[in-house]
Swiss-Prot record:
One of its GO terms (biological process) is cell division. This is Cell division topological specificity factor. Prevents the cell division inhibition by proteins MinC and MinD at internal division sites while permitting inhibition at polar sites. This ensures cell division at the proper site by restricting the formation of a division septum at the midpoint of the long axis of the cell. The keyword Cell division applies. It comes from Beijerinckia indica subsp. indica (strain ATCC 9039 / DSM 1715 / NCIMB 8712). It holds the Pfam family MinE. SUPFAM superfamilies: Cell division protein MinE topological specificity domain. Belongs to the MinE family. NCBIfam families: minE, PRK00296.1. The keyword Cell cycle applies.
Length: 94
């Protein structure tokens, strides 16, 4: 980069291309959000089902996207009888 290039205004094509790439990335993130949540919910249900018998309706998955941080919130209602059985399995395994 020479000294003369430093004071030159950037051409509009690269700026427009960069803005378009940002816009497309944002659109893809918004469109794919519902699919991602459904996939995560099914995988979380599969993992929980390995250890506890429960109803799939008792699992809520929610994703919130902010400007800088995305948050995944998972709420699971585990029956008290299931936690007692899981504790016995851990004791028996030891």
């Amino acid at each position: 980069m020479s000294l003369f290039d430093f004071f030159r205004r950037p051409t509009s094509a690269p700026v427009a291309r960069e803005r378009l790439q940002i816009l497309l990335a944002h659109e893809r993130a918004v469109i794919g959000r519902s699919d991602l949540i459904a996939i995560l919910r099914e995988e979380i249900l599969a993992v929980i089902a390995k250890h506890v018998t429960m109803e799939p309706e008792k699992v809520n998955v929610k994703m919130e996207r902010g400007d800088t941080v995305s948050t995944l919130e998972v709420e699971v209602e585990v029956p008290t009888s299931a936690t007692a059985r899981a504790g016995k399995k851990v004791v028996e395994a030891a």
